């Protein structure tokens, strides 16, 4: 699963997900892409499950680019712990995804194959997504 090799700080604040994605909202590598249509935190496990679903479907043909990377640590407190005594320890990593952000790209396969692979990947994700091609890569 994906996670940063090292970070400047162990813990982060939660933050807010307002507005549309300003960067990462155009197709740069492949011919087809999966675009988020709502904001969400996507865990490294969900990204890995989506990647596996796509690679299993397209088998040997084509290339997949994962444009989303989980760089935000999410902390959790131990079970049945009283309030106070600081923030919990980092448990897993998430990627902050805003509407319009392109998460996966595919090239080297026909459109029906890419569409089905993206559909299988989208089922593993907790948000609504949109399949786009290089011609119409807008929100």
From Swiss-Prot:
Keywords for this protein: Ribonucleoprotein, Ribosomal protein, RNA-binding, rRNA-binding, tRNA-binding
Function: Binds 23S rRNA and is also seen to make contacts with the A and possibly P site tRNAs.
Transmembrane intervals: none
Cellular component annotations (GO), alphabetically ordered: cytosolic large ribosomal subunit
InterPro entries hit by this protein: Ribosomal_uL16, Ribosomal_uL16_bact-type, Ribosomal_uL16_CS, Ribosomal_uL16_dom, Ribosomal_uL16_sf
Family: Belongs to the universal ribosomal protein uL16 family.
Upper lineage: Bacteria, Bacillati, Cyanobacteriota, Cyanophyceae, Oscillatoriophycideae
Organism: Microcystis aeruginosa (strain NIES-843 / IAM M-2473)
GO molecular function, one term: rRNA binding
Protein name, as recorded: Large ribosomal subunit protein uL16
Self-association and partners: Part of the 50S ribosomal subunit.
Stretches of the chain forming a coiled coil according to its record: none
CDD domains for the chain: Ribosomal_L16_L10e
GO biological process: translation
Pfam families noted in UniProt: Ribosomal_L16
Gene: rplP
